[in-house]
Amino acid sequence: MALIVQKFGGTSVGSIEKIQAVAKRVIEKHLEGNRMIVVLSAMAGETDRLIGMAHAIQRVPDLREQDMLVSSGEQVSVALFAMAVKAAGYKAVSLLGDQVGIHTDQKHTRARITSIDAERINGYLDQGNIVTVAGFQGVTDYGDITTLGRGGSDTTAVALAAALQADACEIFTDVEGVFTTDPGVYDKARKIDHISYDEMLELASLGAKVLDIRAVSMAKRFKVPVHVRSTFTNTTGTWVVDEEKIMESLLVSGITYSKKEARITIKKVPDQPGIAAKIFLPISDAGIMVDMIIQNTHDGGLTDMTFTVLRSDYDRAMEILGKVAQDIRAEEVTGDQEIVKVSIVGVGMRNHSGIASTMFQIMSKEGINIMMISTSEIKVSVVIAEKYTELAVRALHDAFALDKDNLPLEVDVD
């Protein structure tokens, strides 16, 4: 008898009718002889509505109280789901994060799971219940409710699968799996049957929205096989598994892009020891994450420092750096929010050289200027003007033949 953890997002449980449809689907899986744990998000739009209410009361909401408020969204979903299962004649029980024993640290609105008590869930499973758990939430050692941040229900599902040694964790969403690129940008995008944890980690960190990066990281750590599939079809989706279980690694598995980036340059900075710390420490203290960094040295002991931040942090970063520039006697601070980071990802890059240069050739052929470059063992990212997003994605997708099952080892850019 297999133990299956299934997670359904807000779109999948966005109405009473959808909750009933999900309950029917879960019951069918249960009748195949499986023990079922179902993790649910809040109904579509509910989390944003609750956060909006918090901001209507406090301009900057108290984070502990915000967690108390926002966590109620999942409580509604799991209670309605359990009722739907019972109405169909089957046993079910709904549990909140603290009832399950999902323990977290004390970082409200972005807590991390520290441990899970499996005893209570196992007891309900042994009694033949379909157990439904509120995603996205947990409890501190002091009894305070916490939430895990956006995408937290994915993390809840994988954490439960790891803690209870489930046979599989199925993440249901409104798409059929992980695609070679965004189907909304290019209709030649192909669903990937299997992808490694490392590739999925890179794609998630670079803008792919199918899986939360913390969920992928946890799945890799505990070797949890994750099946990403559609709520609305019965077709097989994408399996995220250990690289060793994939028969043949593709050269490039996917292309993703992020329009959440902004580029900042501090011009003519004194090129001397400790200057980088003076620039980036105030940024770090403000909780602003810096991504790509390049340095361009001038004659006369001066340098330009260029880096990217999230577009949502751009205004704060520019304000902070305006003061920093005065302190370090830099010439000026400039910025650009109309950029996009385009990335190619594939474990096949480990064993094949020249992938980055091929990407650069393709950009050149299309007349696209590359502003910044970042690489890792299985990823190459470039920053380009946002207006070239679709052109770049399509050109790369065609050049690496991602619409085919078997990718060529040599790429034609002529």
For the regions a protein language model found, what residue spans apply to each?
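Glycine-rich beta-alpha junction loops
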Residues: 43, 175-177, 222-226, 230-235, ...
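Short hydrophobic alpha-helical runs that function as membrane-insertion/retention elements
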Residues: 168-172, 226-228, 291, 372
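Non-catalytic alpha-helical coupling and interface elements of nucleotide-dependent molecular machines
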Residues: 55, 59, 90, 223-227, ...
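A conserved regulatory-domain signal marking ACT and ACT-like small-molecule sensing domains
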Residues: 239-414
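Conserved dinucleotide-binding and phosphotransfer motif residues
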Residues: 32, 88, 222, 286, ...
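Nucleotide/pyrophosphate-binding catalytic subdomain
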Residues: 1-216, 308, 384-385, 404, ...
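Acidic-aromatic/histidine active-site loop/patch
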Residues: 219
